[in-house]
């Protein structure tokens, strides 16, 4: 087995940009900033670089160029958004630009294979934030000041590791660790390996990551498994955006890597279906549909929120959801997938009512269930019980009903309702025609990361 130092050196060669990469990226960045500067208005104070390019923490062959337009803080919110879009569209018009969404819309284009973002922010003093992007220039300055070349490479290793195990990105769909969080963790612990040691030993609570001494009042009021204090805004907890699943996966991946170092932890693994997984096919239900093209940020957020809503409806109908997922090709097709304990239920179910000494509640329970009850009795704990016939016993049929006649009341994001109503395809696990995006959902539901488990 190779030593951990050998593995880390090998991984660094995979993620550290070559001089030619730096030269190409810098050329595109400077030229694009020049285009943006042509179209600025008197209300624009400055045009600056931000993100991983500006901080020098970008990964080889995986980089965006973020250009921030600092707008005078006297501009109102509506004009702020309009100005940002206008400058972005005009400056990138030769590269088929499109709108992306965060707190405010911003404009993106791909130039010579490099994704370029033109993002508006207010020119404000530290702590006087008016938009979510206002902190970004301060983040950039902080990291450029505090990260040396060695730590920048350690950030690259951590980012590559997080990407490989699928927990990189603070968007709602991923619920993972942002690039900025990775930078903070390296500053806090000093190296990639030290971050893994720290994460592999976290406790059930009081997990605070703060470069400076944390404000006790703020920490007490933060509610998340990991509390990560933003060093330029101590009242902001970056850990709020990180899901329990992502934290858990990083903890287990860290333990596995430290126990048995492997370059595989820096390579994105395609999930494969193997023989043992196939026996779970009968427990799957997949809903696939086409949608009108929109920003990947929007569709992923809509899918995640809708997945939670549909899962809740399945649980309310007594279908135990073991695992769920949503996938998209980010072009036109998406799918919801559910692994259930069983796709069928017994025809009858017992409803247990109140204790007979709860006079009014007992009377109400009997009255409410009188017409649909097959039998009613008093059980050994002196509770009224009744046996009723289920409205549905098949998860596929239930999901079909949910996505047609009851779709308006399911909690599915309104932006997806029309897309689903136009046409959707339902598969159960024993269907042999599952392919495309639906197949990707199946892979996510019934496969395990062999590096960790």
Give each language-model segment a name.
Residues 8-27, 31, 35-38, 42, ...:
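Argonaute/PIWI-family RNA-guided endonuclease scaffold
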Residues 110-166, 170, 182, 190, ...:
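Internal, well-ordered alpha/beta segment that forms a basic, Gly-enriched binding/recognition surface
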Residues 50-88, 117-129, 332-346:
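Catalytic metal-binding acidic patch
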Residues 1-60, 77-78, 106-108, 121-123:
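N-terminal regions immediately upstream of nucleotidyltransferase
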Residues 150, 155-331, 338-351:
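Conserved nucleotidyltransferase catalytic core and NTase-mimicking acidic/glycine-rich helix/loop elements
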Residues 74-77, 95, 145-149:
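Short, polar/flexible loop-turn hinges at active-site or ligand-entry regions and domain interfaces
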Residues 329-453:
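Extended, charged low-complexity segments
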């Amino acid at each position: 087995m190779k030593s951990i130092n050998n593995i880390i050196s090998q991984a660094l060669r995979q993620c550290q940009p070559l001089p030619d990469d730096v030269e190409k990226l810098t050329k595109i960045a400077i030229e694009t900033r020049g285009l943006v500067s042509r179209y600025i208005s008197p209300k624009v104070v400055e045009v600056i670089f931000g993100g991983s390019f500006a901080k020098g923490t970008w990964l080889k062959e995986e980089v965006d160029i973020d250009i921030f337009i600092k707008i005078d803080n006297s501009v109102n919110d509506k004009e702020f958004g309009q100005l940002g879009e206008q400058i972005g569209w005009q400056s990138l018009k030769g590269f088929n630009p499109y709108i992306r969404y965060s707190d405010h819309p911003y404009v993106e284009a791909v130039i010579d294979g490099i994704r370029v973002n033109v993002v508006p922010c207010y020119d404000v003093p530290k702590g006087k934030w008016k938009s979510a992007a206002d902190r970004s220039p301060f983040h950039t300055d902080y990291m450029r000041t505090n990260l040396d070349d060695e730590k920048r490479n350690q950030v690259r290793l951590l980012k590559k590791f997080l990407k490989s195990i699928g927990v990189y990105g603070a968007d709602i769909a991923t619920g993972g660790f942002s690039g900025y969080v990775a930078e903070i963790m390296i500053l806090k612990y000093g190296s990639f390996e030290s971050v893994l040691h720290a994460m592999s030993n976290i406790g059930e609570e009081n997990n605070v990551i703060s470069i400076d001494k944390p404000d006790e009042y703020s920490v007490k009021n933060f509610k998340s498994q990991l509390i990560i204090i933003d060093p330029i805004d101590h009242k902001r907890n970056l850990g709020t955006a990180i899901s329990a699943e992502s934290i858990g996966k990083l903890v287990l991946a860290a333990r596995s890597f430290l126990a048995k170092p492997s370059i595989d932890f820096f390579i994105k693994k395609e999930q494969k279906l193997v023989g043992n997984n196939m026996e779970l096919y009968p427990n799957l239900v997949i809903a696939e549909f086409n949608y009108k093209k929109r920003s990947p940020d929007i569709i992923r957020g809509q899918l995640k929120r809708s997945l939670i809503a549909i899962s809740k409806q399945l649980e309310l109908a007594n279908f135990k959801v073991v695992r769920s997922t949503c996938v998209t090709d980010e072009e036109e097709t998406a799918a919801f997938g559910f692994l259930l304990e069983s796709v069928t239920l017994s025809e009858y179910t017992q409803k247990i009512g109140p204790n007979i000494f709860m006079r009014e509640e007992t009377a109400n329970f009997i009255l409410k269930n009188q017409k649909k009850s097959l039998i009613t009795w008093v059980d050994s704990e002196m509770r009224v019980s009744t046996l009723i016939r289920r409205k549905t016993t098949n998860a596929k049929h239930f999901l079909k009903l949910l996505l047609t006649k009851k779709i308006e009341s399911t909690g599915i994001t309104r932006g997806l309702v029309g897309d689903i109503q136009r046409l959707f395809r339902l598969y159960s696990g024993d269907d042999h025609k599952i392919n495309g995006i639906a197949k990707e959902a199946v892979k996510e539901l019934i496969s395990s990361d062999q590096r960790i488990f």
